[in-house]
């Protein structure tokens, strides 16, 4: 006896099977499309941010700062890749440091009280000239030519203190001394050459140097850079990425130098604003000794105000040095220069003095 199938069962199984297969196929296609979307973008995709290609020295880390010295060559230190021999295991003279210094929190120095109730030029000049003519600490061993013996006298008394208690002599003997010399077209390099011969790493900054960085002899570098109290405006710096004007703190960052044993400066009346910048940005903490030539025949670049106010500003800067533990150990009055004080023949003053300070907290 024949059996009768319920209506609709045989025909309904096929559509459900096809529906399941189609669903599985769809899920697989979605997964493949999603995986393909994570790959490189197509030509029509919007590009990412542009990449900046920076010039860096051989061996410098990726992502190094834009403004950095692009050489590591020195006569007595490690030479760059690609040839040359090394005569010392010490690091290269201007290694890529990329230091990030904390800037000072002040915008202005603290002005000292007026010298007298009348706020006159006579009162201010008398106090200032007495201050720069009186040493504050004794130095038993002063030298113009490092520890080397040299019979030729230095044209100017650029004196450093070589007492063992201040550490410079030890740094020279151990060949770890570093000197920065700031100038404007001076041909007098006796002091720099002598310190280099004595074992110091010397960097002379002068915008009149023909090449960007020149190694004259072992340990003596010349850089076509001018030290200013401000960095160039960012718009100007972008147009001239290799501009030759920079603050001293910026130079230290670019060269990767943490400390300067001696800072010598002959800046032809720019010294007052440069010194102010060193104070406000706490760069003085990185300096062991200062040897500055100061000029008194006019206020100096971007120093304004009444005559008595200008002298008060000068005096306040030097008192800031004292607060930073710098003590005057030598003073020299240049009698070969015009005897002028703010364009006047007054107070028996010279227009030019050379002053030497030592940082008593230097380690």
From Swiss-Prot:
Keyword Zinc-finger in record: no
Ranges where the record places region Disordered: 38-97
Biased composition (Basic residues): 63-79
Any one cellular-component term (Gene Ontology): extracellular region
E.C. numbers: 2.1.1.-
Annotated signal sequence range: 1-38
UniProt keyword list: Methyltransferase, Secreted, Signal, Transferase
InterPro entries for the chain: Methyltranfer_dom, METTL24
Annotated localization: Secreted
Gene Ontology biological-process entries: methylation
MF terms (GO), sorted A to Z: methyltransferase activity
Chief localization: secreted
Role summary: Probable methyltransferase.
Family to which the UniProt record says this protein belongs: Belongs to the methyltransferase superfamily.
The protein, known as: Probable methyltransferase-like protein 24
